[in-house]
């Protein structure tokens, strides 16, 4: 009987670990919704920028992402043994927050540069955060395919409240980098426990 209790307790603790690991999905999904929906809508209405330059800036950020993901992935895999995962996670969220702040507080007369820098910061932040975060997911699953499925399921399931949060931020508030930073810190904290 005691063996069954221990197994159940261990199983429940693993589920709690998977849930805590997945909490950053909420602010990340919120940020992605904000960037992909609000930024094009806002910048396309600025006379100097327009829809064409807005699309070009976002496409440029995706091309940069396509190039940097494998390079940073290889680099981070080599550096994780020396520095650990948390360092790279700590770089990622501030980059995302700085990028969002730049996007929603463009400098007068420098809207195009603000747009380009903002989407590049956000994209690099997602790369610096996502690659190590996914690596942590593999590590906590202990290479068990059933646990890996649970980790990914929790992580992706928590993107749903993140999408809803992002939509609320767009609809009900004046979005700024400070709001996202506060939300990020709140949901990022379980990773550092």
Residue ranges, per PLM feature:
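Membrane-embedded alpha-helical bundles of multi-pass transporters/translocases
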Residues: 2-193
